[in-house]
Amino acid sequence: MEQIYVETNHVEDYIAYTKTIARMNMQLASSEDSLMYVTAELQYLMGNYPQAAAGLSTYLARFCPNGRYCTIATYYAANSYYQLKQYDNAIEQYSLLADMNGNPYMEEACMRVAELSYDKAEYRTAYYYFQQMSQVASSSAKRITAQVGMLRCSQNMADTTSVIAVASKLLEEQQIDSVTRNEALYCRAKAYWQGEQYGLALVDLTPIAKEVRTQQGAEAKYLLAACYYHLGAIDMAEQEIMSFTQMRTSHQYWLAKSLILLSDINVDRQELFQAKQYLLALQNNYHAQDDIQTAIESKLQAIAQKEAQQTTDTTYIQQL
């Protein structure tokens, strides 16, 4: 009879029935824990996640933290909620496992909480659990995955100090692939750039900027030229920009930014006519709706003012 109640997910009815039989009460007290768990587990293994979640929730509320199956019941409950896309409930259960040292589900639980929190833009929480995952990772691949998560959280939190630290740690990994290496270099370079550490940014940008067919590489090529410019090496900046114009890229935004920078270089050299020609050509050929056209207009106005000042100065000198 017990088996029938378990298989039909009516264990509560069975327990209620047996409580009406006095001689079974002692046996029931010791077996109710197992009955409740086994019934919920069966629903889970059959893929009946709504019934499993309900049964496991009842088990956890009634018997835990002292029940025989609390750890695995928490794991099954978390997975059931995850399958049902009830992510807040899933996070609650996975968090219990992630914070329970030494349990066999800790690594997976940390990963789930981190990923779900990241998707909710809760980057500080996500960072914490990615960090926990990196410390208990069972392989270098999983440790790298966790470190990439930490890096992206740091990036989203605009924490440049953390970006530099995490990226540097990630770059020490022996089994890191080229895509992940470039991401780490890119993020660290951007952090250095934001901190005006242009010399350090140059080192990280150089290998990424060799391939401008990616968005990352195209931006790196522009930033490389901009770093040289800020360091006063305008000839090197110009060389990088002219190199960029000869490379094939579909990321016209960063090429346009580079040409605007080239115009700035010409202005610094007092070559105003050439600077204006670069801007006018770009204005006629760049049609995307973004901040490039606004930047062009601003630069042209600045050049016009310089030209007017030069004319005024020339007239004044002639009158002397």
Where in the sequence are the language-model features?
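Acidic, polar-rich low-complexity tracts and alpha-helical solenoid repeat scaffolds
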Residues: 1-320
